[in-house]
């Protein structure tokens, strides 16, 4: 790996950019050595590599699209084990984590929509008595966490509880697909670690928000996806939900102190109710988070340091010596205007420049 010097960059730390400084990258890590030698770039705003906490892998082109928009880590939320294995650790591409296939009830609407996806049978859990074996199989195949789709109709509470208990017994966090308020309540009773999606039917209220915060639950609201669902149904003339409950839920949860993580639900699945675009949609998501009440710096943290804290990615998400050199150089300051995350001048993944002139 080559040694790289970035000169006169303003580095994002603790919610703000500092005075211009020189930064050294060596061996794929951020180095504290003196910044001697020629500089690869000069000037700009340097932020940690962005993390999309909800994507669905499709192929190498998925990773290329993510990287082009500054997304250096993607948290897949349901993909067949062979696909995940083929995409893990590819040099110079977005790094990934995955639960492999998400747990689905054979009776759920989600399963009916997704039944033609390759290896979807591996996602099905017949009931609570099958939870241990299902989680064991996914853990043995290398799942980084477990995802449970809570759909109504779908799993009963006993099965959700069993899946969460089996995952926690193996030291794995649990992400719950919960796009309706009753699904959020089921996830809450089961003690999941991460909620994904913000409900479209009814907003989370202050009391429930306080209870969720007390248990340490966090949320990836995927506002870009929720907005896309609403817009797609409206375009078809189909009576459906409105976006405001999702936005209001984020505002309430944020006010209650819940950590908000940025994720899009980017996918290329024909049966999906909406398909946010890989990479580009994360910038849309950050803007929607700001619209829901986060400051631009809080939205940026939702796609960097806060995301790493809750998915066990301690080697990234901040800019400090010894950490993985996943970096994005911007032309403008995103703490002033969050749309500046789109002004990408350069992207480094594990110290290798993948966007911008070498």
PLM region spans:
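C-terminal cap of metal-dependent C-N hydrolases
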Residues: 9, 321-358
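Divalent metal-coordination and catalytic microenvironments
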Residues: 9, 28, 43, 54, ...
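Active-site core of metal-dependent hydrolases
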Residues: 148-247, 268-270, 293
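Histidine-rich, glycine-flanked metal-binding segment
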Residues: 1-4, 10-48
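Divalent-metal coordination cores built from histidine and acidic residues
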Residues: 64-172, 208, 215-228, 232
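His/Asp/Glu-enriched, well-ordered alpha-helical/loop segment
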Residues: 246-330
